[in-house]
A protein has these predicted regions:
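P-loop NTPase catalytic core of nucleic-acid-dependent motor ATPases
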Residues: 99-209, 213, 364
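Conserved AAA+/SF3 P-loop NTPase catalytic/coupling segment centered on the Walker-B
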Residues: 213-235, 270-275
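N-terminal nucleic-acid engagement/recognition segments and initiation subdomains in replication
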Residues: 1-125, 140-144, 375-380, 391, ...
Length: 447
C-alpha cells in the first residue's frame, strides 16, 4: 500500500468523526462502524462486491497492493485489517462480518451484466454458427438445437435453478474445435470448465460453482448404460446443497450452468429404451467448416457476442420454448439412432425367447439364462432388462408375450414380476375352448 498523503490522513480523520464512540472514549468496535468505514473509505468504497455467479466476494477496483484475481483472499484480508486499524477497529470477526454485509448490499452478476449490455445488429447467426465454425449441416434440427441451448443458458443465469435438462453434444470432427467452440461460447475462460470428469466425486458440485458452460467430454466418450443413467439423473437436478467455507450451515445452490458434450465416437449413445431426449447429437465435419474458430479468435469472439445478442433478443421477446416441437422431437429421435450403440443385450434376449418353451419369464431369469450371468443383477441391470422387454413388446420385436399383472413365484428366482406367454385359447377334444379368467369375468361366470 502506498504511503499516506495529507488528503488520506484527512479523510481517515473525517470518517472517524462519523463512527459511534465508546462512553470512555475511542471508537466502538462494532460491525456497523466497520460497515461505515468500508462504505466511505476511498480505497474500500464500491470495491467489495458479492459475485452472484461464483457466490464469492470480489474486489473489483485496484486496492494499492498486488493482486492476482478478483476473488477476496487471505492476503487481502490482512491488508484490509491493517487499514481498519487506522480507524481504531481491531476485531477481525466484526470486520469479516461487515465485509459480507457490504458485499451483499453491493452484489452483481457478471454474466447478466454482459448479456444486458449486448446490442444485436439484426443479422441472424444462430442458424449458421455451427456450420460456420464446425461444418455441421445447416438444417432445422441443428438450428433449433443451438437456439434452445443458448436460451437455456440465458434462462439459467436470469432464473437460477430453472428446469433445463438438454445437453448439446458435438460429435466427430477430430480437430474441428468442438471444445474451443464451447470455451469461446462461455465468453470468459473462467466461465467455462471441462473439469467435470466424475459424478461420484465428493467435490463435483463445487466444480459447478462460478461456471456457465460445463463441458463433459470424457464421461460422454466412455458412456455405458449405467453411466448414461447417472448422467441423465445429474442433468435433471436443478440445485445442489452444500456449504461454502465461511458458512456454518449448508444452503441450496440453484444451478446457473448448462452442460455440453463433445466426443469423436459415433456410437456414444447407449441404447436407452426410456429415451435419450436429453442428449442432442450434432455431427460436425472440420472439412466443411468455413473457418476454424481459433484462426482469428478476435473475429470469432465478436461473432459469438452477436450470437448471444440474437439469443437475448429472442429471450426478451418471451416467444420461445426450451423444448423441441413434436416434429423436431421426431427428427431428433431419428438422428439419435445414428449415434446409438448396437443393443447386444436386446438381441440376446430376443434370441432366448424364440427358443424358450416355458410360459413365464422374469428379469432375474433373463439376466441369468439369456445373458449368461452367474451373479445377481444390480438394480440398474434389472431395470435395463425390463426396458428391453417393455420396448420390445411395444414395438413388436417381441411377439406373443405380455407383462403379468401380479407377482408370481419362479422356482429358481422367488416371487417376481415378469412376463407370460400370450397363447391361443386351448381347445378340448369336443371342440370347446377354455376361457381365460378375464373372459370368464366379462361373461359373469362365478370363478
Amino acid at each position: 500500500m502506498p504511503n499516506e498523503s495529507e488528503n488520506t490522513r484527512s479523510t481517515i480523520s473525517n470518517i472517524r468523526k462519523i463512527l459511534s464512540q465508546a462512553e470512555k472514549g475511542g471508537v466502538q468496535n462494532t460491525i456497523q462502524n466497520c460497515v461505515t468505514v468500508l462504505q466511505n473509505d476511498p480505497i474500500f468504497a464500491d470495491s467489495i462486491r458479492l459475485n452472484l455467479l461464483s457466490e464469492r466476494i470480489d474486489i473489483v477496483k485496484p486496492m494499492g497492493w498486488q493482486r492476482s484475481g478478483p476473488t477476496l483472499t487471505d492476503t487481502d484480508m490482512m491488508y484490509i485489517l491493517r487499514r481498519m486499524e487506522k480507524y481504531g477497529l481491531y476485531s477481525e470477526k466484526r470486520v469479516s462480518a461487515a465485509i459480507r454485509i457490504v458485499a451483499n448490499e453491493n452484489h452483481y452478476h457478471p454474466i447478466r451484466d454482459y448479456l444486458n449490455d449486448l446490442k444485436w445488429d439484426g443479422a441472424e447467426r444462430i442458424s449458421h454458427a455451427l456450420h460456420r465454425f464446425l461444418g455441421a449441416v445447416e438444417d432445422e434440427l441443428t438450428t433449433e438445437a443451438l437456439k434452445i441451448f443458448l436460451l437455456g443458458a440465458i434462462k439459467r443465469v436470469f432464473h437460477p435453478g430453472c428446469k433445463f435438462e438438454m445437453m448439446l453434444c458435438l460429435v466427430g470432427g477430430q480437430g474441428a474445435g468442438k471444445s474451443s467452440f464451447f470455451r469461446l461460447l462461455a465468453i470468459k475462460d473462467e466461465w467455462f470448465s471441462d473439469d467435470l470428469r466424475r459424478l461420484d466425486d465428493d467435490n463435483v458440485f463445487r466444480k459447478l460453482q462460478g461456471h456457465w458452460i460445463m463441458e463433459m467430454s470424457e464421461m460422454i466418450a466412455t458412456a455405458n448404460a449405467k453411466s448414461i443413467e447417472e448422467i441423465k439423473s445429474f442433468l435433471s437436478k436443478q440445485k445442489e446443497t452444500y456449504k461454502i467455507p465461511y458458512e456454518t450451515h449448508p444452503a441450496d445452490r440453484l444451478r446457473q450452468c448448462v452442460f455440453a458434450g463433445t466426443t469423436n465416437r459415433q456410437d456414444f449413445l447407449p441404447r436407452d429404451r426410456t429415451g435419450n431426449r436429453r442428449f442432442i447429437p450434432i455431427p460436425v465435419d472440420a472439412a466443411q467448416a468455413e473457418v476454424h474458430i481459433l484462426d482469428n479468435e478476435a473475429e470469432s469472439r465478436a461473432y459469438i457476442d452477436q450470437l448471444w445478442a440474437e439469443a437475448m433478443t429472442i429471450y426478451n421477446s418471451g416467444d420461445y420454448k426450451l423444448t423441441f416441437s413434436p416434429a423436431m422431437q421426431e427428427a431428433l429421435q431419428i438422428c439419435q439412432k445414428d449415434f446409438m450403440q448396437e443393443d447386444m443385450q436386446a438381441g440376446m434376449i430376443y434370441a432366448f425367447l424364440e427358443d424358450y418353451t416355458g410360459d413365464r419369464v422374469c428379469s432375474k431369469q433373463l439376466y441369468a439364462e439369456a445373458l449368461g450371468n452367474l451373479n445377481l443383477p444390480a438394480e440398474w441391470e434389472t431395470r435395463a432388462i425390463c426396458e428391453i422387454m417393455t420396448a420390445g413388446i411395444a414395438n413388436g420385436e417381441i411377439k406373443g408375450w405380455t407383462a403379468h399383472k401380479a407377482a408370481k413365484r419362479y422356482p429358481k428366482y422367488g416371487v417376481q414380476k415378469g412376463w407370460e406367454r400370450v397363447t391361443a385359447a386351448k381347445v378340448d377334444a369336443d371342440g370347446f375352448a377354455e376361457l381365460t379368467d378375464e373372459e370368464a369375468q366379462q361373461m359373469g361366470f362365478p370363478f
